[in-house]
Curated annotation (Swiss-Prot):
Compartments (UniProt record): Cytoplasm
Lineage: Bacteria, Pseudomonadati, Pseudomonadota, Alphaproteobacteria, Sphingomonadales
Active site: C239 (nucleophile)
Protein name: Phosphoadenosine 5'-phosphosulfate reductase
Reactions performed catalytically: [thioredoxin]-disulfide + sulfite + adenosine 3',5'-bisphosphate + 2 H(+) = [thioredoxin]-dithiol + 3'-phosphoadenylyl sulfate
Family: Belongs to the PAPS reductase family. CysH subfamily.
Amino acid sequence: MSAFHLETLKSLPKAEQEAALSEANRQLEEMSAEDRLKWAFDNLSGQFVLSSSFGIQAAVMLHLVTRKKADIPVILTDTGYLFPETYRFIDALTEKLDLNLQVFRAALSPAWQEARYGKLWEQGVEGIERYNDINKVEPMNRALKTLEAGTWFAGLRRDQSKSRSHLPILAIQRGVFKFLPIIDWDNRKIHYYLKEHDLPYHPLWDEGYLSVGDTHTTRKWEEGMSEEETRFFGLKRECGLHEG
């Protein structure tokens, strides 16, 4: 597999671009997560960044990637509505792993947003999507541009939701390479990795949370619920960062 140059690949006719990505993904599927990362650093172009929501199992990707590239920028899009436990978790992991944390926020503060728009998360799917655009999508786009990203690592997994079940390891999204090295991991593998490397779950894991985002759109898991139903009142799974 030869090196991938983003601008060259983006300039190809769509069919050729898809064929090149498909062949790369076919080979990447046979590799371990560690080997996938090595391949990415050896073959993908541009600056590398890693995004993290500092969710329940976030320590896995943070540890896995920073072992390969200690100073990689770690992007957090901070809505201002994260759980207190999440902010403390961010502080703890940043210190433990010596993270190069880069925090991006919306142009308007949470209080100003509420004054202007009301509580967008209480305004149905349209309100949630507008909230996500303001607090997640725009700050992430700005982060990718500011950090001159060419390759974006993320910790999405196929077993997390239906919307992620067919995602490839390598794609082009938002004009950069999107690379998902643990896409085929399950909860068991995640658990063993955390234990092997003495890494913590998010503190709310012990209180019954399977997924953690903002305080106003996150629910504890209850019997009969899917993980998807614990976020955004079950109306949608994605916060916008990993769509489109």
